Amino acid sequence: MAIILPELPYAYDALEPYIDAETMHLHHDKHHQTYVNNANAALEKHPEIGEDLEALLADVESIPADIRQALINNGGGHLNHALFWELMTPEKTAPSAELAAAIDATFGSFEEFQAAFTAAATTRFGSGWAWLVVNKEGKLEVTSTANQDTPISEGKKPILGLDVWEHAYYVKYRNVRPDYIKAFFSVINWNKVDELYAAAK
């Protein structure tokens, strides 16, 4: 059973005006599909390792050397994007009281968390992701990864992620990444973040 491209949980234009429909079509139907195709091609070379990408990427040294980088790139790309779509919604949501308290305790305030996350997304050189994760100590942490690397490979559990590859924003925002990052905060699905936080603690 091969990895398949998940359907978007909303219409392509549902996140307008923050994320445009053209970008969503290209990002989901083309870019994410390519990661799925390439991950499947890599896995087909070693059927004995199975298809549990989370388990494989949590222990990258266990991945056969000839497909390791392909799975880091494309398996990571699939996992990151499958999560990313679920982390956005056209509905207005807010962090639960428990998550809000954890954010305040870790960062000082929601505004300081937003500033830290924005800085991680803005300063990630080239392509990559900004993340809010639950680290090995069970604490919240803002971090970023290069390319399609996943925090799972560092023993961290991602609960919020933002794709800062240019393909994620260039159609609408051109080279102004900070405007895209600001817009993302208008479409975050805090209900999903809460769910992931509860499961990760």
UniProtKB/Swiss-Prot annotation:
Outcome after substituting residue 148 to P:
In strain: 1293, 1454, 1565, 1639, 3051 and 3203
- Keywords, alphabetical: Manganese, Metal-binding, Oxidoreductase
One GO cellular component term: cytoplasm
Positions the record marks as coiled coil are none
Catalytic activity reads: 2 superoxide + 2 H(+) = H2O2 + O2
Q: Which GO terms describe its molecular function?
A: metal ion binding; superoxide dismutase activity
Q: Does the keyword Manganese apply?
A: yes
Q: Does the keyword Metal-binding apply?
A: yes
Cite the cofactor comment.
Binds 1 Mn(2+) ion per subunit.
Effect annotated for changing residue 42 to V: In strain: NEM1278
Residues annotated to bind Mn(2+): 27, 81, 163, 167
Give one Pfam hit by family name.
Sod_Fe_N
Name the PANTHER family on file: 37S RIBOSOMAL PROTEIN S26, MITOCHONDRIAL, SMALL RIBOSOMAL SUBUNIT PROTEIN MS42
Q: How does it assemble?
A: Homodimer.
Its family remark reads: Belongs to the iron/manganese superoxide dismutase family.
The identity of this protein, by name, is: Superoxide dismutase [Mn]
Q: Which organism is this entry from?
A: Streptococcus pneumoniae serotype 4 (strain ATCC BAA-334 / TIGR4)
Q: What is the lineage of its organism?
A: Bacteria, Bacillati, Bacillota, Bacilli, Lactobacillales
